[in-house]
Regions:
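Repeated scaffold domains used in trafficking and secretory/extracellular systems
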Residues: 91-93, 155-157
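Beta-rich carbohydrate-recognition and catalytic domains
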Residues: 1-40, 45-91, 99-150, 165, ...
Length: 200
């Protein structure tokens, strides 16, 4: 998790009771930087290299780190220069593999949330499709900016796996930093539940 004190650093909290409670690791932080924006870790196990991968948002790029034990991290590469939209800070990264419909092929998808700089102003989620070898993500179409949703109410998208039918499930804010603090609710912000149907 990102520990926010005088600067943003990455720390560990672990559970020994199936997630009912968490203990902060005594040797936190496990990863530091001099960068002003250094946050939103996405950590996953990369089977091919037998290492943990951490993707972090750092200014207007994503940085990739690897570890064998979740405590000692090595910088592998950065992604972002000359890629996608750069109208604001890059946040909430995600990186995962998906099957390509109608083929036996799989491709990697990197999500990048941007604020401001969306196609209609304010916040938005862009994505990149390509390859990942455990160290470096390579975008297959670097001259294109791809948006996950063209509406104004889609930001901070994150995904998780391990659904019973092997789906990758995504969830996002149904809001925008242009007006997130001005919605007419007090116990929650924007809708509690929304669904999108159809093939689009």
């Amino acid at each position: 998790y990102t520990q926010n004190s005088d600067r943003q650093v990455q720390s560990i909290a672990y559970s020994t009771d199936n997630g009912r409670s968490f203990t902060k690791y005594e040797n936190n932080p496990v990863l530091t930087s001099d960068a002003r924006d250094f946050r939103d870790p996405k950590v996953f196990w990369h089977k091919e290299t037998q290492r943990w991968i951490m993707l972090l948002a750092v200014g207007q790029e994503m940085q990739i780190f690897s570890s064998s034990n979740l405590k000692d991290w090595a910088f592998e590469s950065s992604f972002g220069e000359g890629q996608g939209a750069h109208g604001g800070v890059w946040e909430c990264p995600d990186l995962f593999e998906l099957p390509v419909d109608g083929t036996n092929e799989k491709k990697w998808v990197l999500l990048c949330n941007l604020n401001p700089g969306g196609p209609f102003g304010g916040s938005a989620t862009q994505y990149f499709v390509g390859t990942f070898n455990g160290k470096e993500f390579v975008n297959e179409s670097p001259s294109k900016t791809k948006w996950m949703d063209w509406g104004k109410d889609h930001y901070a998208t994150v995904t998780w796996s391990d659904a019973p039918d092997n789906r990758r499930i995504a969830i996002a804010w149904m809001s925008n930093w242009q007006y997130a603090n001005d919605v007419p609710t007090s116990q929650y912000r924007s809708p509690n539940q929304a669904a999108q149907y159809g093939d689009n």
